[in-house]
Amino acid sequence: MRVWPGRGRIDRAWCAPCEASFARPTNRCKQCSLRTAPGITHCADCQQTAPNWSLGAAAVDYAYPWSALISAYKSGTDVGLGHGFARLMTHNTGTRAILTNADGWVGIPLTPAKLARRGFHQIHDLMNQLQQQLMRPPRILRGALEPLRHASAQKTLNLRERMGNIHNLFATTKGTDDLRGLHLVVIDDVSTTGATLHAATAVLLKAGAASVNVVAFARTPKPDG
């Protein structure tokens, strides 16, 4: 059992009051998944310069209490959180629609050094949890992307710096015949500016994917809210 912040005990799933308080459905941009006003399908940034993927969605904002829980999950301190994260993603209409309408899922990979340090690949676990909770889930294309190098820490960088930081970050291990014509979903735990998702999408489209959508459990809000 774990204790949810100020809300009581949980056992691999959120209680209804906590889900209502911290994972309330909200209107989001259909591409970058930032919060938008009701009735607005695309934020101003995406209307001006659209991402290279088709559709994007996130279940929650990267904020309290999710930020701390995601850190615990990624570090392997509390791997059981993946079940609850996947549950929120499969119950959120935006993320569920994208996840289920695909030929395959591609997870953002970890570098060997980072995987060795953590001993746990949170994206692989999250995709496994998602598959278990969907009736007819798409297949997971394991190893479709591989990291070419370790990117510098992204947290302190702005969007322009991040885009430069992820240049030649990934390669695909699949041939064009393996990916050609497929409708893919790239899955990550957190989308901060979308730079990492952009890099992954570019590689998959170049390899012949018909389309790429993206899903993250959490989306970092803009600094101004």
Residue ranges, per PLM feature:
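Glycine-rich phosphate/pyrophosphate-handling loop used in enzymes and phosphotransfer proteins
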Residues: 1-225
